[in-house]
Amino acid sequence: KAARLNVGLPAEGRIILFVSQKVTDERKGMEYFIDAIDRLVKQHPELKDNTSVAVLGGNTQLVCDRLALKAYPLGYVSDERRIVDIYRSADMYVLPSLEDNLPNTIMEAMACGVPCVGFRVGGIPEMIEHRRTGYVANFKDSADLATGMNWVLQEADTEQLGSACVSKVARCYSGQSVAMRYIEVYNELIALKRYIV
């Protein structure tokens, strides 16, 4: 709750987070996000009473009025502590990106224990373990994206998801784990060179 108060978000209720440097960038999938939120609210109108959306990035004011849930345009933020508080305020992070290799925002959200929902594209399915650290929706499928959001919000054990997210980041993306993988690759190359020579 302290994190939410620090960034001007409501202390009560659930918050869905969307982050992009420029939220109107077509590649980040805002149109699919808007459609999925609309579908989610139509299927579960009770969410209007206790769920809102926080939008972080440039041009947030251009999209918040189009969302079927109460939305908080946070604008562009560069202060790292504030960004961490924003992630910690969220109950779920949604990135319906249409093309992305290894989105830092998913890594950042997971490091803060926030379950993620995204499309099956690029490196996203490698980052989000389906129904373990979040939900991987079929590509460009707003209905499945809405299903994933509902699963995280109303069906999944969010505490277990959050713990799995933190573990995954520590295991796969920490500086130490990345360094160890480089060492393994170098050792394999050295062994291969000895074999060839």
Predicted features by range, described:
Residues 1-8:
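A short helix/loop element that forms part of the nucleotide-sugar donor recognition site in Leloir-type
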Residues 10-28, 34-38:
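Conserved donor-binding/catalytic core segment of Leloir-type glycosyltransferases
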Residues 47-51, 57-81:
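Nucleotide-activated donor-binding/catalytic signature segment of Leloir-type glycosyltransferases, i.e.
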Residues 85-90:
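Short alpha-helical donor nucleotide-sugar binding micro-motif in glycosyltransferases
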Residues 98:
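Aromatic "clamp/platform" in nucleotide-sugar-dependent glycosyltransferases that forms part
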Residues 115-118, 128:
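Short hydrophobic beta-strand element within catalytic cores of glycosyltransferases
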Residues 130-131, 135-142, 151-156:
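Conserved acidic donor-binding segment of nucleotide-sugar-dependent glycosyltransferases
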Residues 157-172, 181-184, 188:
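A short, well-ordered alpha-helix in the C-terminal region of glycosyltransferases
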